[in-house]
């Protein structure tokens, strides 16, 4: 079976996806009429506007990336505060999302970031308490989603590739993750959200 990396850029709050999703919400997602907004070898961009999902209108944008077509995923790093679109252009990316959390005044990551053995930033206690329960590990253009915690971060020794902590981790091995470590207000508050997933 083909392996796809799907990047979901939500102009919605994906709070209800794992908790509190109704049967109506499930059916709305299953029967959504996706519009293909762009397609080229290895990349398909889709969008759907839903009048009612999780008790309000939602717009969902999804990018499916097929690594078997030569597409690679990378964690882009840039100095200072720049828009995601500028960082994408610097790295010649075809698509990009803001992958983690950062200090809005200083521009540095507030989540663990390590590239090829060099620790660039560590996760703040506040972020661990609020939402950081996962990370993206990238090496040679391949992504792996992994659980993350303060204990894992303290012992993390891998020298090759890039790891970027973020969260919350939504699924692990096809099962919903425990969100009890996440601050409830973050989970319940509706904001635009982004998510990354891999499929087999």
Spell out what each predicted region is:
Residues 18, 66-68, 149, 175:
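Generic signal for short, ordered secondary-structure residues
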């Amino acid at each position: 079976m083909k392996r796809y990396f799907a990047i979901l850029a939500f102009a919605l709050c994906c709070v209800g996806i794992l908790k509190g999703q109704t049967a109506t919400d499930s059916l709305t997602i299953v029967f959504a009429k996706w519009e293909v907004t762009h397609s080229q070898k290895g990349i398909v961009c889709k969008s759907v506007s839903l009048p009612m999902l999780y008790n309000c209108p939602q717009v969902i944008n999804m990018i499916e990336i097929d690594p078997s077509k030569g597409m690679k995923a990378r964690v882009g790093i840039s100095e200072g505060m720049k828009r995601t679109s500028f960082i994408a252009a610097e790295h010649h990316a075809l698509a990009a999302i803001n992958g983690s959390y950062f200090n809005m005044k200083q521009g540095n990551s507030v989540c663990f970031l390590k590239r090829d053995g060099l620790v660039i930033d560590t996760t703040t206690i506040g972020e661990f308490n609020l939402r950081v329960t996962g990370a993206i590990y990238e090496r040679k253009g391949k992504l792996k989603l992994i659980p993350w915690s303060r204990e894992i971060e303290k012992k993390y020794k891998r020298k090759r590739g890039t790891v970027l902590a973020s969260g919350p981790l939504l699924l692990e091995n096809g099962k919903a993750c425990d969100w009890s470590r996440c601050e409830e207000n973050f989970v319940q508050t509706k904001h635009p959200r982004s998510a990354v997933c891999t499929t087999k």
